[in-house]
Amino acid sequence: MINTVRNTVMAIINKDNNGYITPDEFNLFAKQAQLEIFEQYFYDYTNWVNKRNSRLANDGYSDIQKQISETIDSFSDQATLTYNSGAGAFPAPADSYFVNVLLYGNKEIEYVAQTKIMNLISSNLTTPNVSYPAYYTKEQFFYVYPTTIQTNVSALYVRYPVDPKWTYSVVSGSPIFNQSAGDYQDFELPQSAQNDLVFKILSYAGVNIRENDVVQFAMAGENTEQTKQS
């Protein structure tokens, strides 16, 4: 999909000799566009759930909520966490957007707000143990109790999409798409996001080359796509 998106972007930019963006600039804009759309899925999903709960959306729109949920699920991952003795905690996976569940072996570790963890520890009735562990999170670290738990902890989480990269070979002075390059990376979003990607990248490109017409075209396209999805 990334080559199709780039070809479309370049065709629109070059239509009236508006300017040019380099492959590195395209990749930078592509990364930001993918991240924006990825984060929008969570907002859209919550919005659709609220609409259904408030009976503002009928059952005919349930497929939209399902599609968004499936897209988010495609970024689900699991990782074993490595204890950091200096911090006394487990660092979150480097690519995690948010963590759904922490596990100690096969046991779910209960999340507790940091302000309440000391109350649990101070009581013999509620203090966490290896059968009923607990944790709180702070600055991308998970503090697990009892503190004797330092291994066998894993996270079920939603990861960020991998940064896209349009790779190329230079032929007669021009960059030509090279999908076989070792660092090639397509977008991880579904095909349905292609138009959104084009318009968002165009918006960044228009600002970069200082072409207001390109920015206005991109904004109009984004508004059209948002209307379709609402």
Describe each PLM feature range.
Residues 1-230:
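Glycine-enriched, solvent-exposed interface loops adjoining structured elements
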